[in-house]
Regions:
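Conserved Class I S-adenosyl-L-methionine
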Residues: 191-260
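Conserved class I S-adenosyl-L-methionine
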Residues: 1-49, 52-61, 148-173
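Class I SAM-dependent methyltransferase SAM/SAH-binding core
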Residues: 62-108
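Short alpha-helix
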Residues: 173-189, 195
Length: 260
């Protein structure tokens, strides 16, 4: 997907850069560490899955859903384009003999490379895929009982709305959203269900400088006034014992359907 300047993001077109990103990301993770907000999403996913099911997970990343899936299904297959990710997951789940791994891009998966599974699921894994409809066809083809797409969505952190509306900055608002998937599925004659899940994330910063620097990254302008950022952040920040906390309410969407 093209960025706000009409260019393909480097990580989308450069497999080596993407691999470096994941290799570096997992070094900063404690073994088995997941994002706290993912637990609430998984509780909704779990409602569609039975203990005897086989599940195929697309782009598991550092295991937000992989780890709980492994504890709740008969068979789990993880498909990811990153060697680093698959090695990390294998290391974390050595005792899980019912989990297998396929190193491949989902959209390039050969027709006979993996068997159909009861459930096919992918959460926040579509950002590098050019042909989204082809990816959806692949999900529909390989799911025997249900296909599930998960995606975290807006609203964006509220101080960016102030920077946009009050100060006129160009902001990197979320672009690919669950509505796009619903529309593409509709074009495929699939009437999908959609569940919106309210979520909360608390960003924790060691210093004020780290807070301001991190929460300026979605400003697209080449220059900006730091005072504007600080003023926009002020209503949303709590300082406690020298650390800074920013609570952000957002949502996840679960789009799912019975395969046709």
């Amino acid at each position: 997907m093209k960025d706000w300047h009409g260019q393909m993001p480097e990580r989308m077109v450069d497999d080596q850069l993407e691999e470096q990103f994941w290799a570096q990301s997992i070094t900063r993770k404690k073994t088995g560490q997941t994002d706290p907000y993912a637990a609430k999403i998984f509780q909704e996913i779990k409602k569609s899955i039975q203990q005897e099911d086989s599940v195929l997970e697309i782009g598991p990343g550092w295991g937000n859903y992989t780890f709980p899936l492994a504890e709740n299904v008969r068979q789990l297959t993880c498909v990811d384009s990153s060697d680093s990710i698959l090695s990390y997951l294998q290391n974390c789940m050595q005792e899980h003999q019912h989990v297998s791994y396929i190193h491949a891009k989902w959209e390039s998966l050969a027709e006979n490379e993996v068997a159909a599974h009861d459930i096919v699921i992918g959460v926040n894994c579509f950002y590098r895929m050019y042909e989204i409809k082809s990816a959806l066809y692949q999900m529909n083809r390989l799911a025997k009982k249900r296909a599930i797409i998960g995606m975290t969505t807006g609203p964006i952190q509220p101080h960016y709305e102030i920077l946009y509306k009050k100060y006129g900055y160009d902001i990197k608002f979320p672009r690919r959203d669950y509505i796009e998937f619903l529309n593409l599925l509709y074009e495929m004659d699939i009437y999908a269900d959609c569940k919106i899940i309210p979520l909360e994330r608390v960003y924790d910063y060691e210093s004020y400088e780290q807070l301001v620097t991190t929460q300026s990254k979605k400003i697209l302008n080449t220059t900006f006034d730091r005072a504007h950022v600080e003023e926009s952040l002020k209503p949303f920040i709590e300082e406690k014992n020298g650390r800074y906390y920013y609570r952000h309410d957002f949502h996840a969407a679960l789009v799912s359907w019975e395969p046709k």
